[in-house]
Each structure stands twice: as C-alpha cells, then as structure tokens.
C-alpha cells in the first residue's frame, strides 16, 4: 500500500522526515507553505534567481517569515498552538520593514543635522575671532590717540545677538568686507579716510584773528648800524612799543660803549646816549627803529597796533636817521 501511494502521488523518498531534529521541514509540511512536492529543483532555483525591488534585508519571503515566527514560538515560554495568526504576522512584518526604513531615515537626518551644526559652529567661531581682533585693534588705537576707533563691520560672519553692538552712529563709515580678513590697521585707514568730512568755510575775519594770535616764530633778528653783530628779540614778551625801545637799549648799549674810549667826557655823555635810545620811535634822534614786514617792505615802527606789528614783523633794524629819506621822516611827523 505504501508503495502504491508513493507512486500515485509521485513523491521522492522521504529521507529527511526520518531525522527528528529537522523541524523546519516538518513545519513546512504542517503549514503547507513549502513548495509543491511535484515541483522539481529547477523551480526552486528559478525562484531564488527572481529579481525583487527594495533594499537588501528589508523585504523577506513568506518562508523566512514563517520560520522566524516558528522560532519565536519555540523560544517563548508561553503556550502556543504551533503557529501565529495571520494578522500578527502581517503586523510584525510591517513593523520590521517600517522600523528599518525609519531607522535609515533617522540616521540620514542625524548626519545632515550634525553637518549643519558643525558648519554653524565654524562660522560662529570665525566671527568671534574677528570680533576679538577688532576689539584689540580698537583698544590699541584709543591708547595711541592717533585716530578714532573703527565702527564694527556689518559684513563679518554672523555673531550671537547678545555679542552684537546695539547702537551705531548715523555717520558710521561703510565697513570693509573681504576674505581673508583685512588687517586692523588697513581697516582703520579705510574707515578714517571715508569718515573725513569737508572743512566748513570760515570768515576772513576769523582767519585774520588766528594768524594774529598763533604766530609760530616770535623771535625776530635785529641789527644796528655800526655794530657788526646782530641779536634776536622775542616780541611776544613785550606788550607795547615802549617796552621794545627799552629792550633795544639793553641789547646794544654795551656794544656802543665798547667801541668808544672810556674817558670822563664819555661817561659824562652817558645821559645823551640814553636820550638817543629813547627817541628811537619818533625818528628825531640819532637812530631810528624800522622793521621789514611779511612782504619785504621796510616800515617805521609804531605805525600799526602792537598786535599787528608782532604778527607781521620779520626783521628789525636800528638805522641812522641821516640815512633815512626825508620823505619818510616827514610822513611820520604828519602822522
């Protein structure tokens, strides 16, 4: 009977059924999920070579799912009916596939987020370094006092909002942008040149006052006829022409005495010498005091106010009155 049944069904010898440890074959026979016994080995090879869409490891065959369910049933301590229901199988397969896909997407998103975080950190670090460098340059320039501190650049990499300056002047110069960063002294030069404004026009009277009060060289050369050595006098140290006349007397009185013999008659004439120096300003004595102005013209001392004389006098001379022209003396007398 057994041989007849085997011939009728066309089955190969059931050698593996005699092995008690081969539970997978028994499971296939029990559930009927294996291949039909009439199918040959060629059909199995064709099924293995079938092309399937999807990532490796995420799509599983029905046989693999059945084997997995069977192993879980054998390992679990709870009682079972030797197979799992269909809905549990489908839910488990869907959860595994979706979980795997979610895990893959999460890893990709984590990598992209980590890359973006690294880029932002690098930009923030570069911005902090530039901000520190600009602060150091500004402090050094303030200590030197050569130029005002530069305004904070707007084109630098973004810095945190709490470190960003809140107030800026209306007339702030345009920032100097570039990469690699421009050195601090070049940035200061560019900002100072762009922040310079045109000077405001001033009145002629104001310019005249400045030239009168701000004379750089108050020392003036003075020479006297008959004395080969000249002297220098500070006009700013005196407030009137009388003080200037007494100063000229002190400068050249000793030279005049050295040129003459020291006799009793000469000593008696000392009062006459004082009178000569006293009449320097009006031109009625033996000597007359004149000066050269900024244009090189020879003028008589005492014609203009004292401040104008101090600002325009370039050189003084004590000349003999006999050498002066009569016209100049006559004009002085009329004045």
UniProtKB/Swiss-Prot annotation:
<protein>
    <recommendedName>
        <fullName>Auxin-responsive protein IAA6</fullName>
    </recommendedName>
</protein>
<dbReference type="GO" id="GO:0009734">
    <property type="term" value="P:auxin-activated signaling pathway"/>
</dbReference>
<feature type="short sequence motif" description="EAR-like (transcriptional repression)">
    <location>
        <begin position="51"/>
        <end position="55"/>
    </location>
</feature>
<dbReference type="InterPro" id="IPR033389">
    <property type="entry name" value="AUX/IAA_dom"/>
</dbReference>
<comment type="subunit">
    <text>Homodimers and heterodimers.</text>
</comment>
<comment type="similarity">
    <text>Belongs to the Aux/IAA family.</text>
</comment>
<feature type="domain" description="PB1">
    <location>
        <begin position="217"/>
        <end position="321"/>
    </location>
</feature>
<dbReference type="Pfam" id="PF02309">
    <property type="entry name" value="AUX_IAA"/>
</dbReference>
<keyword id="KW-0804">Transcription</keyword>
<feature type="region of interest" description="Disordered">
    <location>
        <begin position="81"/>
        <end position="102"/>
    </location>
</feature>
<dbReference type="InterPro" id="IPR003311">
    <property type="entry name" value="AUX_IAA"/>
</dbReference>
<keyword id="KW-0805">Transcription regulation</keyword>
<keyword id="KW-0678">Repressor</keyword>
<dbReference type="GO" id="GO:0009733">
    <property type="term" value="P:response to auxin"/>
</dbReference>
<dbReference type="InterPro" id="IPR053793">
    <property type="entry name" value="PB1-like"/>
</dbReference>
<dbReference type="GO" id="GO:0006355">
    <property type="term" value="P:regulation of DNA-templated transcription"/>
</dbReference>
<keyword id="KW-0539">Nucleus</keyword>
<keyword id="KW-0927">Auxin signaling pathway</keyword>
<feature type="region of interest" description="Disordered">
    <location>
        <begin position="143"/>
        <end position="180"/>
    </location>
</feature>
<dbReference type="GO" id="GO:0005634">
    <property type="term" value="C:nucleus"/>
</dbReference>
<dbReference type="GO" id="GO:0006417">
    <property type="term" value="P:regulation of translation"/>
</dbReference>
<comment type="function">
    <text>Aux/IAA proteins are short-lived transcriptional factors that function as repressors of early auxin response genes at low auxin concentrations.</text>
</comment>
<feature type="region of interest" description="Disordered">
    <location>
        <begin position="188"/>
        <end position="207"/>
    </location>
</feature>
